[in-house]
């Protein structure tokens, strides 16, 4: 983190964007035992996921917990009227595949009644990158959502 801090060319931590400062503050309190416990939890989740992949070729999840939000907003404060405690919450659906190192691809699945896009992430088992890419290619050839362009909003 220190080397990255130098790249910002900042005089003090308070000049960091709020999200980066939050990351720094949380990260500096992590101890070795915390990392070991996290690895143990990750391994348990990996076992559960491997069990799922015995029965399913892919897992499908939304690409986000909410539709795109106002461009001048750093992050939403609420999801479904529930106040969120960190900006990570609106991206939380990616946690599973990211932490477990699973090949994942997002594909467009349409728009809401305001014309805002939504996607679906397709997750494959470890080392099945080609399988998930081929699935996404076939899906796009059938549904071709990427050809639909909503009108730009002000």
What feature does the model see in each segment?
Residues 37, 69-90:
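Short, surface-exposed loop/helix-turn segments at secondary-structure junctions
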Residues 57:
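Conserved acidic residues
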Residues 35-36, 98-154:
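Structural helix-boundary/capping segments
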Residues 50-51, 84-107:
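Small-aliphatic-rich amphipathic alpha-helix that forms the alpha element of a beta-alpha
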Residues 1-50, 66-67, 103-109, 113-116:
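Short helix-loop capping/hinge segments that flank enzyme active sites or metal/cofactor-binding pockets
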Residues 63:
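Substrate-recognition/cap regions that form aromatic- and gly/pro-loop-enriched pockets
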């Amino acid at each position: 983190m220190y080397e990255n801090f130098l790249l910002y060319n900042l005089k003090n931590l308070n000049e960091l964007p709020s999200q980066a400062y939050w990351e720094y503050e949380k990260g500096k309190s992590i101890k070795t035992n915390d990392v070991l416990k996290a690895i143990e939890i990750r391994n348990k989740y990996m076992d559960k996921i491997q069990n799922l992949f015995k029965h399913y070729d892919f897992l499908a999840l939304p690409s986000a917990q909410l539709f795109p939000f106002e461009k001048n907003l750093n992050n939403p404060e609420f999801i479904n009227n529930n106040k969120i405690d960190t900006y990570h919450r609106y991206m939380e659906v990616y946690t599973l595949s990211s932490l477990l190192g699973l090949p994942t691809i997002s594909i467009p699945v349409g728009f809401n009644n305001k014309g805002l896009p939504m996607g679906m992430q397709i997750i494959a088992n470890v080392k099945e990158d080609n399988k998930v890419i081929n699935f996404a290619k076939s899906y796009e050839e059938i549904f071709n959502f990427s050809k639909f362009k909503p009108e730009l909003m002000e």
